[in-house]
Amino acid sequence: MNPVIKTFQFGQSTVTLETGRIARQATGAVLVTVDNDVTVLVTVVGAKQADPGKGFFPLSVHYQEKTYAAGKIPGGFFKREGRPSEKETLTSRLIDRPIRPLFPEGFMNEVQVVCTVVSTSKKTDPDIAAMIGTSAALAISGIPFEGPIGAARVAFHESTGYLLNPTYEQLAASSLDMVVAGTSDAVLMVESEAQELTEDQMLGAVLFAHDEFQAVIQAVKELAAEAGKPTWDWKPAVANTELFNAIRAEFGEAVSQGYTITVKADRYARLGELRDQAVAKFSGEEGQPSASEVKDIFGEIEYRTVRENIVNGKPRIDGRDTKTVRPLNIEVGVLPKTHGSALFTRGETQALVVATLGTARDAQLLDTLEGEKKDPFMLHYNFPPFSVGECGRMGGAGRREIGHGRLARRSVQAMLPAADVFPYTIRVVSEITESNGSSSMASVCGASLALMDAGVPMKAPVAGIAMGLVKEGDKFAVLTDILGDEDHLGDMDFKVAGTAKGVTALQMDIKINGITEEIMEIALGQALEARLNILGQMNQVIGQSRTELSANAPTMIAMKIDTDKIRDVIGKGGATIRAICEETKASIDIEDDGSIKIFGETKEAADAAKQRILGITAEAEIGKIYVGKVERIVDFGAFVNILPGKDGLVHISMLSDARVEKVTDILKEGQEVEVLVLDVDNRGRIKLSIKDVAAAKASGV
């Protein structure tokens, strides 16, 4: 073994890259260690030959967190890691997004990246280490790759400014959580959530990260120079310009006309006809190109046609200019039995969004490397195939659905009330019923509307917009509210969500180099204009949260008892609290400080549970009259129950003003009587009287 080790300073952290000791049969393998806190093994394997049956680049990224890394044994019956968690899926996407555009066009060999967290102190997120390791492993592998890339996480505090690669503790106090990745001269990916920061503050964070991760890129270059394998002898296929020119001459004008059809289904039908005609004319005969080659070139003609039209100032596919948002149609309260609902339609994109309120027990239990925790807010995004007029697989959420759901969640989360103000668990589900671009941002708008319809006290309404970019040479056009085709054919997908005051989420994916600060400023400015436009239309339908929760939502009552009384409410083995829940049909959560939250499907159920708890925790008050039940009769008096678990003694002399020979002459067991509390001694024994009740009532007790 001859391991090569490269150590460098990255902000306040010391990063070590090591190769040549572990996973030597992989095409590229790097062990990344950050401050002895996090260690990630990253491997890259590339197939030497492309699969001719695949018409796409088969890149897969797998990020996995091993529980042994944090000194834990997995839960469950099998005691081993299972399917990827949501965190692992999101991090896999985070790594995939900046590296995918850096593989050369036409490269179709399968590439698999596996990032394994093997050690962590649970102080920082291992995702940045995994991204650095991916860059290094690709750089030394010899696989055609236009990297390396750098990556960094940025936090922000109003008083201290930007902070590079913060710990979990520092992130908790930050108003920004942003991950940025890119090359030495370009930003390729941004993923962030914020607490209403300005556009300038968000752009500043992107530029700060880009400057800081240059140290990563330089270190990876030095590692590759010392330990890199020879670059693969791969060349892209020679473009068939003769065939391209022939098809464009025959069909170019018709394709351009096809892209003036504003209805998506009609446009696709017309372009499909033209594609079939091109295949029939230019393939099929001996010596002619294959049908797949003709289709590929036809797709290239579509790509160039749309882009040239846009940068030359012609109307977009649906006739809009570059800054216009598609027509909106907004409804709330569309589903009568749900807690909150909204139907948000923007052009041919539509989301049916539903908000549901639950108890603290409904919170999502997360088993992470940092330990178990509960998440009281969930946002789930569903993208069924019918939303784009297709048949397709139905089943669990895929990577795309998980990623879009997380972006929508990030967008609205900062505007949710604090748990001590609104202690409900909240689940929002966005059902995409139509899709033609930016369904995730439709989910943001719909989620904000549904939450306000449910009566969740949002700090402010939230809206989102997707921006696009087409850049040809020195010409460029920034597009507001992109269609699906514009997303596919453009150079940038730039999604911004926020309130009227500031940005709450920013996601950016760039497919080309050369996105300047000027272009990002223009995109953020146009996004702000569009966001304010959408918020204005949303506010006309529902401008603030409803003052009362939906009648269908559970009723919540908060109360507090003395900590000494917690044991009484819970009872032996939980018997008392179980009995209350079963009899009242309410759910009860008790904290160690005596705070109690009661959730009932109806107000009556919650009130009944509250009264039961008050009865258990109440103390007998001297001088107060109670209606009690005779529990036991003895020679010297009777024991009467006046509160749950609290009996007092009525001495025989306190039964009546007249002389009483036998207690049973006055009382019988099970009888209800009014009693006056005379005294409670230091041992908690209660002295009662029946004969003094009348006098006490007369005196106004």
UniProtKB/Swiss-Prot annotation:
Cofactor(s) listed: Mg(2+)
Quaternary state and interactors: Component of the RNA degradosome, which is a multiprotein complex involved in RNA processing and mRNA degradation.
Amino acids binding Mg(2+): 487, 493
Gene Ontology biological process terms, A to Z: mRNA catabolic process; RNA processing
Underlying gene: pnp
EC number: 2.7.7.8
Biological function: Involved in mRNA degradation. Catalyzes the phosphorolysis of single-stranded polyribonucleotides processively in the 3'- to 5'-direction.
Domain called KH: residue spans: 554-613
Family classification: Belongs to the polyribonucleotide nucleotidyltransferase family.
Reaction catalysis annotation: RNA(n+1) + phosphate = RNA(n) + a ribonucleoside 5'-diphosphate
NCBIfam families (alphabetical): polynuc_phos, PRK11824.1
Compartments reported by the entry: Cytoplasm
Signal peptide range in chain numbering: none
Protein name: Polyribonucleotide nucleotidyltransferase
Any one of the GO CC terms: cytosol
InterPro entries, per database record: ExoRNase_PH_dom1, ExoRNase_PH_dom2, ExoRNase_PH_dom2_sf, KH_dom, KH_dom_type_1, KH_dom_type_1_sf, NA-bd_OB-fold, PNPase
Superkingdom, natural source: Bacteria
Species annotation: Pseudomonas putida (strain ATCC 700007 / DSM 6899 / JCM 31910 / BCRC 17059 / LMG 24140 / F1)
Any Pfam family matching the protein: KH_1
Recorded GO MF terms: 3'-5'-RNA exonuclease activity; magnesium ion binding; polyribonucleotide nucleotidyltransferase activity; RNA binding
Lineage, opening ranks: Bacteria, Pseudomonadati, Pseudomonadota, Gammaproteobacteria, Pseudomonadales
Keywords per UniProt: Cytoplasm, Magnesium, Metal-binding, Nucleotidyltransferase, RNA-binding, Transferase
Domain S1 motif per the UniProt entry, residue ranges: 623-691
